[in-house]
Regions:
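Conserved beta-strand->loop/alpha-helix structural units within folded catalytic cores of enzymes
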Residues: 1, 14-16, 128-137
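SF2 helicase/translocase NTPase motor core
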Residues: 2-109, 115-121, 149, 153-155
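PAPS/PAP-binding and catalytic site of the sulfotransferase fold
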Residues: 26-29, 134-145
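Conserved helicase ATPase motor motifs in RecA-like P-loop NTPase domains
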Residues: 120-135, 143
Length: 155
């Protein structure tokens, strides 16, 4: 999608213990060599250097901008605000790693993530644990992907 000019950024959200793995391993392992990219990791209490990196998210550049956040950030206004600003400023993919973290439709972070989905040009979910306790566990994940998926169901 990046090579075809359809997107210029990605917001990747995962649990706290996992999201730094994206920076340290996953992105460089799977990114094609010809793609120039910059990774910025969310920290709710950034150092001076981290503040400069956060500012990079909103500057025009010719690289793929990747913003990594933990899912817990969406329980806070600060986290929601920066994710909103990022998505509004880019043609972005919004990806949720370990998407079972948004399985509870009534949870604050699930509501925040689902609300922000409309700002992303593309959405993806990833999970290594597709087994659920109930079919309703899939509802919020499906709603994140496609807002029209469950038009007749109200939770």
């Amino acid at each position: 999608l990046y090579d075809k000019g359809h997107l210029n950024a990605a917001l990747i959200v995962s649990p706290k213990g996992v999201y730094t793995n994206w920076k340290n391993e996953q992105i460089q392992r799977h990114m094609p060599d010809h793609v120039l990219y910059k990774i910025v990791v969310w920290n709710p209490n950034p150092t001076k250097k981290e503040k400069e990196e956060l500012n990079f998210l909103f500057e025009e550049k010719n690289v793929l901008t990747i913003f990594l956040m933990n899912i817990e950030a969406f329980s806070t206004k600060k986290g929601q605000d920066i994710a909103t600003k990022f998505l509004l400023g880019h043609n972005a993919m919004f990806a949720i790693d370990e998407s079972t973290t948004i399985k509870t439709p009534t949870a604050a972070r699930t509501k925040a993530v689902v609300k922000l989905r409309q700002l992303a040009k593309y959405r993806r979910i990833l999970t290594g644990s597709p087994v659920t306790k109930s079919p309703l566990d899939l509802y919020a994940q499906a709603e994140f992907l496609d807002p029209e998926f469950c038009l007749c169901v109200q939770v």
